[in-house]
């Protein structure tokens, strides 16, 4: 019975999955995972781990010919003030008012020579006790944006928990597993 429940929960869908009407016809070739990941307060030191988890999932999904990793993007940002400003303007507008700023996304896409921008956000990251059980918990949302139009053509989110007794689960490994689960729902052509 326990094995059946484990298998059934492993096949469960994700909490949120929204696909734009044209997403199945969009044929992106190059994606960049932005290093500007929103994290819960006090956990910013894990940003690179989450960005790499999203990169690994995007690469594994095999939806793109090439995926630019967030550490390369971060390095390029540190050398290019225009890129840094474009990413900060874009992500702040996206998070504060839900607006995908076409001017900023075009700059980002042109600099990286990418046709898709992947933006991540972490809603939960840590350990806690719920109903007497100790858990590690990671919650993540991923958005993919068409550079040419500025339209968010896919967004999805999910949260996973792992119960533990003695050893805390590795949150970075949980994030990688969670990102791959979310990318299982990426629109296919």
Residue ranges and their predicted role:
Residues 7, 32-33:
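Conserved Rossmann-like nucleotide-binding pocket used by diverse enzymes
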Residues 38-41, 73-76, 123-127, 160-163:
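Solvent-exposed loop/turn segments at secondary-structure junctions
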Residues 11-31, 52, 57, 62, ...:
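C-terminal/domain-edge helix-coil "capping" segments
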Residues 1-11:
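Sec-dependent bacterial lipoprotein signal peptides
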Residues 34-35, 40-112, 185:
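N-terminal segment of the mature soluble domain
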